[in-house]
């Protein structure tokens, strides 16, 4: 019996050790491909495009570096001089205090309940509940808009978002760019969930 318990504890420790090295970034992704006949997305050459508000913004440069790695992983090649496509990169992140269910925390909360005992008595109660301090959650979103330079038409658009407790934005944004390009260049219709494991 003692030997069986020892084996069980060792198996449990091995399982916990295996789980502790990775975390899952679950992303909500919406991608739309609208390339006309004759426009080849796979292996296409591209350059980055910036909005006036992004010029000189250091975050835009970091976003482009991360997007470039994700674009290279699906076969697109950066070539500023010979580009067929332009890529507009979007990146946004916010943080908020979360209630116990993961929604933005509205402040203090409580409840008042009035009841009647069975078969006798009545009662009134008041309760307050709050965690100290409420946990911080992070919402991050990325987008990529690929446009054919000859026609000016958008040929591929994708958005990915993630809500979670991790504060390492650089790693999470890089993972979101990978998720945004899942199933490139033929994404399924409608929203999809993309899970990517990354080290803790």
Where are these predicted regions, by residue range?
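Sterically constrained small-residue positions within well-ordered secondary structures
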Residues: 10, 39, 78, 128, ...
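C-terminal/domain-edge helix-coil "capping" segments
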Residues: 19-37, 132-200
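A structural detector for beta-sheet-dominated domains
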Residues: 49-51, 90, 115, 147, ...
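Sec-dependent bacterial lipoprotein signal peptides
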Residues: 1-19
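Surface-exposed short loop/turn segments
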Residues: 89-151
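"Short basic amphipathic alpha-helical interaction patches in structured regions
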Residues: 63, 101-105, 158
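Immediate post-signal peptide segment of exported/extracytoplasmic ligand-binding proteins
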Residues: 37-45
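N-terminal segment of the mature soluble domain
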Residues: 44-100
